[in-house]
Amino acid sequence: MAAKFLLTILVTFAAVASLGMADNVLLSGQTLHADHSLQAGAYTLTIQNKCNLVKYQNGRQIWASNTDRRGSGCRLTLLSDGNLVIYDHNNNDVWGSACWGDNGKYALVLQKDGRFVIYGPVLWSLGPNGCRRVNGGITVAKDSTEPQHEDIKMVINN
């Protein structure tokens, strides 16, 4: 199950990288400018000109960053460290996800279930010889009773 999920994410990244920005994806280094949106099914994520990031379901507001009127000409940018930041027209940060990691390739995905999630580099993976460090992560010992599967990988989003 986890392997299929990871494969789906990897295929999505590959498709988006080759085609440019999808309607529901913002890649690291990309910016969503004022009054533009990501769209997935019934959900829309919009960065408003006055700096409010708002999620709508079927046109009805269901979440907001509560940063309305903290600037103008605002934009939403996914940084190369995975931090999602709202900047005003003077490049002042108005709001941030306050979650970041090592520099890498990240993707903000507005999913069809309405969640918006930042995906990024694998922090660790379990190979046939146990777990090994990835990106300076924690070394985790493999339980001897656990089956060995090269295809098990875990991404931790804090």
Curated annotation (Swiss-Prot):
Domain Bulb-type lectin: 23-131
Residue stretch(es) of the prosequence: 137-158
InterPro entries linked: Bulb-type_lectin_dom (IPR001480), Bulb-type_lectin_dom_sf (IPR036426)
SMART domains assigned to the protein according to its UniProt record, in alphabetical order: B_lectin
Keyword Chloroplast (UniProt): no
Cystine residue pairs: 51-74
GO molecular function: carbohydrate binding
Keyword terms, alphabetized: Disulfide bond, Lectin, Signal, Taste-modifying protein
Signal peptide start-end: 1-22
Matching Gene3D superfamilies: Bulb-type lectin domain
Domain of life: Eukaryota
The keyword Disulfide bond is assigned to this record: yes
GO BP term, pick one: response to other organism
Subunit architecture: Homodimer and heterodimer with curculin-2; Disulfide-linked.
Functional description taken from the UniProt entry: Taste-modifying protein; sweet-tasting. After curculin, water elicits a sweet taste, and sour substances induce a stronger sense of sweetness.
Designated name of the protein: Curculin-1
Protein species of origin: Molineria latifolia
Gene that produces this protein: CUR09
